[in-house]
């Protein structure tokens, strides 16, 4: 079995009543915005080998199911308790974020528990819908999820190549999609020290609620493969432009498979040892025959 460097965050989003009202109850419009936010999240997290899969959206159309307060810490704690007691029984997920139209005190636009990823009570965040610009809100969500992944705020010694890094304490007027060197180190330390298990499993394509996006590195309904952008695709069997396997593909893995084709008949695939005479490919299968 090949080593898979990727981690997978199965994300559940809750839209509070104020945000539903802000969009005049147009849930389709909110969904479209959410799908765009998640696409940006995947762009941001791809360099860290993290894929974000949206596995659920809940709209609080009639009333909020928690007390959404302008004190961000109070709202975060209330949302965490609701999520722990209600959501696991309904939807398998790794992390939940509350999208809200409330204006938090002291200029706060989001909050999250540090290193909370995979914790039953702490794998949550809150994000204020503070801008009409998708990138601004997506970066805020990436920032809060970053806290869940063990990242702290950047200081003056942190850099991401001259850009305004994601984990700065305050959102820049010219935000970028880049994490700093400090964030990379803190994330690595979190993975090494906390060993969060919930982000190791790849979600099923049928669990993902957002429309399939060819090129996002996540296998979704209707796709035969998805190896990311064409320039980054490492899968020789996959047509990155269509997310379909090439018509000539015979195999993808196996002792008798090479570059998506069966190895020629007679090719040695298992050395002779003791009573085992070894094995040779048939030219018709990716598996090495067992005598």
From Swiss-Prot:
Posttranslational modification = Glycosylated; glycans contain fucose, galactosamine, glucosamine, galactose, and mannose. Sialylated; 75% of the hemorrhagic activity of native bilitoxin-1 is lost upon removal of the sialic acid moieties of bilitoxin-1.
Instruction: Cite the Disintegrin domain residue spans from the record.
Output: 211-291
Q: Which residues are glycosylated?
A: 89, 155, 181
Q: Which residues bind Ca(2+) 1?
A: 10, 94, 198, 201
In-chain residues carrying the UniProt-annotated modification Pyrrolidone carboxylic acid: 1
Instruction: Please give the chief subcellular localization of this protein.
Output: secreted
Cite the entry's keywords alphabetically: Calcium, Disulfide bond, Fibrinogenolytic toxin, Fibrinolytic toxin, Glycoprotein, Hemorrhagic toxin, Hemostasis impairing toxin, Hydrolase, Metal-binding, Metalloprotease, Myotoxin, Protease, Pyrrolidone carboxylic acid, Secreted, Sialic acid, Toxin, Zinc
What processes does the entry annotate via GO biological process terms?
A: proteolysis
Q: Where does Ca(2+) 2 bind?
A: 213, 216, 220, 223, 226
Disulfide bonds, paired cysteine numbers: 118-198, 158-182, 160-165, 214-233, 225-243, 227-238, 237-260, 251-257, 256-281, 269-288
Q: Locate the Peptidase M12B domain: which residues?
A: 7-203
Comment on bound cofactor = Binds 1 zinc ion per subunit.
Question: Where does the sequence pass through the membrane?
Answer: none
CC terms in the record's Gene Ontology section: extracellular region; plasma membrane
Which residues are listed for Zn(2+) binding in this entry?
Answer: 143, 147, 153
GO molecular function ontology, one term from the record: toxin activity
Q: Which cofactor is recorded for it?
A: Zn(2+)
Q: Please summarize the record's notes on activators and inhibitors of this protein.
A: Inhibited by EDTA and EGTA, but not by cysteine or soybean trypsin inhibitor (SBTI).
What superkingdom heads the lineage?
A: Eukaryota
Expressed, tissue-wise, as follows: Expressed by the venom gland.
Pfam families in the record, alphabetically?
A: Disintegrin, Reprolysin
Q: Where in the cell is it found?
A: Secreted
Q: Its quaternary structure?
A: Homodimer; disulfide-linked.
Further details from the record: The disintegrin belongs to the long disintegrin subfamily.
Q: How is this protein named in the record? A: Zinc metalloproteinase-disintegrin bilitoxin-1
Species in which this protein is naturally found: Agkistrodon bilineatus
């Amino acid at each position: 079995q090949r080593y898979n460097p990727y981690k997978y965050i199965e994300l559940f989003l809750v839209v509070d009543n104020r945000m539903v009202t802000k969009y005049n109850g147009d849930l389709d419009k909110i969904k479209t915005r959410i799908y765009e936010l998640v696409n940006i999240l995947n762009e941001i997290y791809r360099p860290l080998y993290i894929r974000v899969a949206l596995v659920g959206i809940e709209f609080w159309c009639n009333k909020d199911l928690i007390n959404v307060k302008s004190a961000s810490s109070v709202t975060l704690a209330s949302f965490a308790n609701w999520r722990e007691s209600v959501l696991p029984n309904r939807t398998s997920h790794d992390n939940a974020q509350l999208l809200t139209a409330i204006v938090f005190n002291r200029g706060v636009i989001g909050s999250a528990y540090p290193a909370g990823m995979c914790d039953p009570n702490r794998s949550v965040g809150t994000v204020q819908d503070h801008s009409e610009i998708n990138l601004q809100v997506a970066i805020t969500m990436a920032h809060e999820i970053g806290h869940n992944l063990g990242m702290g705020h950047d200081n003056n010694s942190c850099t991401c190549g001259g850009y305004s890094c994601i984990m700065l304490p305050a959102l820049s007027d010219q935000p970028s999609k880049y994490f700093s060197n400090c964030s990379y180190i803190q994330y690595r330390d979190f993975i090494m020290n906390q060993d969060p298990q919930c982000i190791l499993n790849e979600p099923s394509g049928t669990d993902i609620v957002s429309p399939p996006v060819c090129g996002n590195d996540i296998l979704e309904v209707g796709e035969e493969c998805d190896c990311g952008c064409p320039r980054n695709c490492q899968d020789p069997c996959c047509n990155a432009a269509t997310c379909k396997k090439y018509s000539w593909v015979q195999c993808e893995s196996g002792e008798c498979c090479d570059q998506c084709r069966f190895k020629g008949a007679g090719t040695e695939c298992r050395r002779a040892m003791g009573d085992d005479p070894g094995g040779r490919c048939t030219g018709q299968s990716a598996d090495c025959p067992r005598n």
